[in-house]
Amino acid sequence: MTGLFSYPKRHLKKLVKDGDYVEALEFGKSLEAKFSNDPDYLFIMGGIYFILEDAKKAMPYFEKSLDIKNDDVETLMLKTNAHLLLQQKNEAIVCCKKILNLEPKNYEAFGLLEKLESV
């Protein structure tokens, strides 16, 4: 068990993979000072909040992750979905367009953008 705690992000990912989201959230919060500028950590924490249906708390993690690594399509897609949960259609459209600038053949973003622009 010592090995997992030598690699705290690995332990955090394992908790998420095992579906222990509440425990992962608590453990992740304890790592925040050490990993506050790590885009992978920020993505994981935002993802946990998103899974726990707290898009409002997920958003700052996604935003900071994208400030550090602005070409991360996975983070942009989760941020898009968080905007949708928060009923922020225009922000979701902006995210879809950013995804398509990075990956013009991203069918998920393309389909979602078409749907959002037609409503």
Residue positions per predicted region:
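Register position in tetratricopeptide repeats
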Residues: K17-D18, I51-L52, L85, K115-V119
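Conserved structural position within tetratricopeptide repeats
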Residues: K29-A33, E63-D67, L100-N101
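Helix-start (N-cap) detector for alpha-helical repeat units in TPR-like alpha-solenoids
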Residues: L4-F5, P39-D40, V73-E74, Y107-E108
